[in-house]
């Protein structure tokens, strides 16, 4: 199996992109809203008083207040609703009623379940238990921390069921079914905050961030796809000041172009498997509406790294880029295959930059906790 050098593409923005004369308004993730609903319901269960608003902590340490739309007694405990405000992001879950039904259980600790409107995971590759609810790790942790602010989970047991009225209908407008999540939406979010990234304004903010680094005399810009990869990048390059780290989201091409335009000498990219696979295929604007993970490329990388034909076939048929990563890891091929993938991304970025900058690439695990592969300065 071979894979030639791909053509370089930087697709246009989605049709939802708008240039606005004022700053875009951020919103809250489904995970943050589910956390707030949980705390409201549990507070009412403990105190007998339904709160009009609740305060929760976000992963970065900031604390925010959410209005509670409804908080009622039920046969199973207390049910509370927080309505999602997605800000200016074109999010199909804007206005969704994140509902938490909270009751006691006999065993100490927290039991978190998905109710109607929350999807069920049916395929591997998402980092979630197959057969379980589509509630991602960060929202699970946020909910646990919010519960622990109200009761001592070492002493009492709490059961939380998250549901979303009309969630199954909302999910039809998402990629959930293709990913193997059926019956509803996912409870998502790594920061608790929704940033309206699929807009021309977000791309402009990426370019501006590179400009600021250049204006301060820095020679290297470090491109990260999100909060976890930025934390990993800071661990990898602790000598660089904060201004060098740019959260590019889907706009890697725009950031590289800005780095060349403003005379920087180096670009480092730190990402996870899915985004790296898109870049390796020559796609420099990686919004999900404009690109998909090229699994045939990952299959070719598998063979090149010494993997068997059966493993290459499994990778090519994987459900997601993460699923391919997990197959490599299980086969003991994550290091060699990941290094090759990073090398391909490095080649793409250098070509896109016309060899005007040096390029280093690192792949980190899905927790952003460790570097698992690299090309350039981090190569073994």
UniProtKB/Swiss-Prot annotation:
Reactions that this protein is recorded to catalyse: Co-precorrin-5B + S-adenosyl-L-methionine = Co-precorrin-6A + S-adenosyl-L-homocysteine
One Gene Ontology molecular-function label: cobalt-precorrin-5B C1-methyltransferase activity
Protein name: Cobalt-precorrin-5B C(1)-methyltransferase
Pathway: Cofactor biosynthesis; adenosylcobalamin biosynthesis; cob(II)yrinate a,c-diamide from sirohydrochlorin (anaerobic route): step 6/10
Keyword Methyltransferase: yes
Keyword vocabulary terms for this entry: Cobalamin biosynthesis, Methyltransferase, S-adenosyl-L-methionine, Transferase
Species the sequence originates in: Salinispora tropica (strain ATCC BAA-916 / DSM 44818 / JCM 13857 / NBRC 105044 / CNB-440)
InterPro entries: CbiD, CbiD_sf
EC number(s) recorded for this UniProt protein: 2.1.1.195
S-S bonds: none
Domain of life: Bacteria
Protein family (similarity comment): Belongs to the CbiD family.
One Pfam family named in its UniProt record: CbiD
